[in-house]
């Protein structure tokens, strides 16, 4: 068992009508439809992805 830090992310707005790169980032986070949640490893790369689409997601 490792003690890796995690972050829980929820998609709260639709990526329709956003930039293609932002839609790809949402998919990269593993989020598909509004309300979907993922628990991800808390790394600088994941934090950067969350920051890029912060207007679409919510950190729980």
Curated annotation (Swiss-Prot):
Oligomer and partners: Part of the 50S ribosomal subunit.
Protein family: Belongs to the universal ribosomal protein uL30 family.
One Pfam family cited in the UniProt record for this chain: Ribosomal_L30
Keyword Ribosomal protein: yes
Domain of life according to the entry: Bacteria
Keywords noted in UniProt: Ribonucleoprotein, Ribosomal protein
PROSITE patterns xrefs: RIBOSOMAL_L30
Gene: rpmD
Name under which the protein is recorded: Large ribosomal subunit protein uL30
Any GO molecular function: structural constituent of ribosome
CDD domains named among the record's database cross-references: Ribosomal_L30
GO cellular component terms given for this protein: cytosolic large ribosomal subunit
A biological process from GO: translation
InterPro entries: Ribo_uL30_ferredoxin-like_sf (IPR036919), Ribosomal_uL30_bac-type (IPR005996), Ribosomal_uL30_CS (IPR018038), Ribosomal_uL30_ferredoxin-like (IPR016082)
């Amino acid at each position: 068992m490792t003690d890796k830090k995690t972050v829980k992310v929820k998609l709260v707005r639709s990526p329709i009508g956003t930039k293609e790169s932002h839609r790809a980032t949402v998919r990269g986070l593993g989020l598909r439809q509004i309300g979907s949640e993922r628990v991800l490893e808390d790394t600088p790369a994941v934090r950067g992805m969350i920051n890029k689409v912060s207007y679409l997601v919510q950190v729980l």
